[in-house]
Swiss-Prot record:
<comment type="subunit">
    <text>Homodimer.</text>
</comment>
<keyword id="KW-0963">Cytoplasm</keyword>
<protein>
    <recommendedName>
        <fullName>D-aminoacyl-tRNA deacylase</fullName>
        <ecNumber>3.1.1.96</ecNumber>
    </recommendedName>
</protein>
<comment type="similarity">
    <text>Belongs to the DTD family.</text>
</comment>
<dbReference type="GO" id="GO:0051500">
    <property type="term" value="F:D-tyrosyl-tRNA(Tyr) deacylase activity"/>
</dbReference>
<dbReference type="GO" id="GO:0019478">
    <property type="term" value="P:D-amino acid catabolic process"/>
</dbReference>
<dbReference type="GO" id="GO:0106026">
    <property type="term" value="F:Gly-tRNA(Ala) deacylase activity"/>
</dbReference>
<comment type="function">
    <text>An aminoacyl-tRNA editing enzyme that deacylates mischarged D-aminoacyl-tRNAs. Also deacylates mischarged glycyl-tRNA(Ala), protecting cells against glycine mischarging by AlaRS. Acts via tRNA-based rather than protein-based catalysis; rejects L-amino acids rather than detecting D-amino acids in the active site. By recycling D-aminoacyl-tRNA to D-amino acids and free tRNA molecules, this enzyme counteracts the toxicity associated with the formation of D-aminoacyl-tRNA entities in vivo and helps enforce protein L-homochirality.</text>
</comment>
<dbReference type="InterPro" id="IPR003732">
    <property type="entry name" value="Daa-tRNA_deacyls_DTD"/>
</dbReference>
<keyword id="KW-0820">tRNA-binding</keyword>
<keyword id="KW-0378">Hydrolase</keyword>
<dbReference type="InterPro" id="IPR023509">
    <property type="entry name" value="DTD-like_sf"/>
</dbReference>
<dbReference type="GO" id="GO:0043908">
    <property type="term" value="F:Ser(Gly)-tRNA(Ala) hydrolase activity"/>
</dbReference>
<dbReference type="Pfam" id="PF02580">
    <property type="entry name" value="Tyr_Deacylase"/>
</dbReference>
<feature type="short sequence motif" description="Gly-cisPro motif, important for rejection of L-amino acids">
    <location>
        <begin position="137"/>
        <end position="138"/>
    </location>
</feature>
<keyword id="KW-0694">RNA-binding</keyword>
<dbReference type="GO" id="GO:0000049">
    <property type="term" value="F:tRNA binding"/>
</dbReference>
Length: 151
């Protein structure tokens, strides 16, 4: 399972003109389930995300986690993170989990995030979404927990 994290001062996602999720300072996590992923990969990815030290401490060093700063978490599903661009000019998404598996893992990830962190907002799985953000830094970090079957 993978995520592209962006440290933000604010972010929101809209579907059909209606805001479905919005945060202030925190992390925007674009999340993708891959072929072979299970809840175990989702749990490991979330644990890493919540503890990743990407926020500044008093000295200006990236030394504080999302949990330590009490920031918001905006989780948006994005199967295109699994794109394979090695052949031709059209990306292949064959590495992404099937839609039903992707939805189940996304919902599991969000439920666990809500159980472990205060402020969690979301997009809508499978919808065409508009994501607005102000990237702080900019800080953009890819995270990936490979499926156990690929290890």
């Amino acid at each position: 399972m993978m995520a592209l994290l962006q440290r933000v001062t604010r972010a929101r996602v809209t579907v059909d003109g209606a805001t479905t999720g919005e945060i202030g300072t925190g992390l925007l996590a674009l999340v993708c389930a891959e072929q072979g992923d299970t809840e175990a990969e989702a749990d490991k990815l979330l644990a890493k995300l919540l503890k990743l030290r990407v926020f500044a401490d008093e000295g200006g060093r990236m030394n504080r986690s999302l949990q330590e700063v009490g920031g918001g978490l905006l989780v948006v599903s994005q199967f295109t993170l699994a794109a394979d661009t090695s052949g031709g000019n059209r990306p292949s998404f064959a590495n992404a989990a099937p839609a039903d598996t992707g939805r189940a893992l996304y919902e599991h990830f969000v439920a666990r995030a809500r159980a472990q962190h205060g402020e969690v907002a979301t997009g809508r799985f499978g919808a065409m979404m508009q994501v607005e953000l102000v990237n702080d830094g900019p800080v953009t970090i890819p995270l990936r927990i490979p499926p156990a079957s690929a290890a």
